[in-house]
């Protein structure tokens, strides 16, 4: 199984990139969002890979982050969602936007993806409602670590973000407020303090 490709870009197609790894070229099917973030021919390229093996074919799907790859697999756990539709969803929504849509049961946001009709959108937001928070929380933690550094205490941060979203704020609003609170309170702040400071940020 191939988990990651590191090489140079040989060619970028409509829905794939050809990655040259020491003279061997691999075709990795990607979302439009991933393809837009890649460079040009002969530039370095790193992709997280999901390998599909079927009786008559082997396909590689490439992602910029491991989190995007996890969402790709989670989406396909829903009936009626295959690799093509999962890539279409990830082309339309970022992992954070997708988490928000599921948390808010926003079928309209999900149905913007090509190939996602009302029934599939309903199944996606309904069936993933109780399974997506872990992915959303991981996305928030990654974003906060990038913003604040590796010293972020994951549990208080996740608890604070969860509390603010339960009060009706979007995950993006909550994450931004907690990030600002962390800068004021410090890395060792508990969740109660982060919630209090986060609410002050949101009230501005």
Swiss-Prot record:
GO terms for biological process: DNA recombination; DNA repair. Keywords: Cytoplasm, DNA damage, DNA recombination, DNA repair, DNA-binding. GO terms for molecular function: ATP binding; four-way junction DNA binding; four-way junction helicase activity. It comes from the Bacteria. Residues 152-204 are annotated as: Domain III. Residues 65-143 are annotated as: Domain II. It is found in: Cytoplasm. GO terms for cellular component: cytoplasm; Holliday junction helicase complex; Holliday junction resolvase complex. InterPro entries: DNA_helicase_Holl-junc_RuvA_I (IPR013849), NA-bd_OB-fold (IPR012340), RuvA (IPR000085), RuvA_2-like (IPR010994), RuvA_C (IPR011114), RuvA_C_sf (IPR036267). Belongs to the RuvA family. Has three domains with a flexible linker between the domains II and III and assumes an 'L' shape. Domain III is highly mobile and contacts RuvB. Homotetramer. Forms an RuvA(8)-RuvB(12)-Holliday junction (HJ) complex. HJ DNA is sandwiched between 2 RuvA tetramers; dsDNA enters through RuvA and exits via RuvB. An RuvB hexamer assembles on each DNA strand where it exits the tetramer. Each RuvB hexamer is contacted by two RuvA subunits (via domain III) on 2 adjacent RuvB subunits; this complex drives branch migration. In the full resolvosome a probable DNA-RuvA(4)-RuvB(12)-RuvC(2) complex forms which resolves the HJ. The RuvA-RuvB-RuvC complex processes Holliday junction (HJ) DNA during genetic recombination and DNA repair, while the RuvA-RuvB complex plays an important role in the rescue of blocked DNA replication forks via replication fork reversal (RFR). RuvA specifically binds to HJ cruciform DNA, conferring on it an open structure. The RuvB hexamer acts as an ATP-dependent pump, pulling dsDNA into and through the RuvAB complex. HJ branch migration allows RuvC to scan DNA until it finds its consensus sequence, where it cleaves and resolves the cruciform DNA. This is Holliday junction branch migration complex subunit RuvA. It comes from Rhizobium leguminosarum bv. trifolii (strain WSM2304). The lineage of its organism: Bacteria, Pseudomonadati, Pseudomonadota, Alphaproteobacteria, Hyphomicrobiales.
